[in-house]
Amino acid sequence: IMIQLLDKIHHKDSKNFFLIAGPCAIEGEEMAFEIAEKIVKLSDKYKIPYIFKGSFKKANRSRVDSFTGIGDEKALEIIKKVGEHFNIPTTTDIHENAHAELAASYGVDVLQIPAFLVRQTDLVVAAAKTGKAVTLKKGQFLSPESMKFAVQKVLDSGNDKVAIIERGNSFGYTDLVVDFRGIPTMQNYAPVILDV
C-alpha cells in the first residue's frame, strides 16, 4: 500500500486506517502548526498514521474575489516547516503543471490532483514525473472504471506511487453521494482512499 512508501509516516505498522487532515487552505503559520500539533497528538494517542494536508493555493474558487491563498512560496514554506517540525509527511493539491515541481521542491511528499482536473494529462504526468506519490481525486462526473486511465498516466510516467481518492458522484447539482460499489472496481487499478 502507498502509505508504506512514505518514510516519515508514524504508526505505519499499526494496521489502523490512516488520516489525511489539515486546514483547507494554508492561511498562516500559527494556524497550520496548531492544527498539525493537535492532530499529531491524537494520531500518536490512537496509533493512526497521519499525513498533513493543506492547500497552498485554492485555485478552484467559485467567485473571482474569493480567498485563494497567502502566496504560493509562503504557503509551501509553511507546509515544509510543519512536515519538518513534526516529522510527518505532507500533501497539497496542485492546479497547474508548474505547481508539481514547485511543490516537490518544498519537500511535499504527496501531490494531489483535484477532482475537476483529474483528466488533465499534462498535469497528471507533471505530478508523476516528480517521483512523489500522487493521489488522484475521482471527479464527481467520472465512473469508477474511467479512473484506470488517470492511474495509467501516472504508471506510464514511471511512477508507481499512486492512489485514488473517492469523494462521491454528483447527485443533483450540489450534492455528492459515494457509491461504495465502485470502490472494488477502482482497487483493481490502485489503492483507494475515502474522502469523508
Sequence positions of predicted segments:
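N-terminal amphipathic alpha-helix/helix-capping segment at the start of soluble metabolic enzymes
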Residues: I1-I20, E77
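Alpha-helix-loop-beta-strand connector modules within alpha/beta enzyme cores
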Residues: E37-Y46, D65-T91, A126-A133, G182-V192
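Catalytic beta/alpha-barrel core
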Residues: I70-G71, H85-A100, D109-D122, A133-P144, ...
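Glycine-rich, proline-tolerant flexible connector loops at the mouths of alpha/beta enzymes
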Residues: P23-A32, Y50-D72
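Catalytic alpha/beta core domains of metabolic enzymes, predominantly
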Residues: T130-V196
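Short beta-strand segments at enzyme active-site cores
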Residues: I48-S55, P89-I94, L194-V196
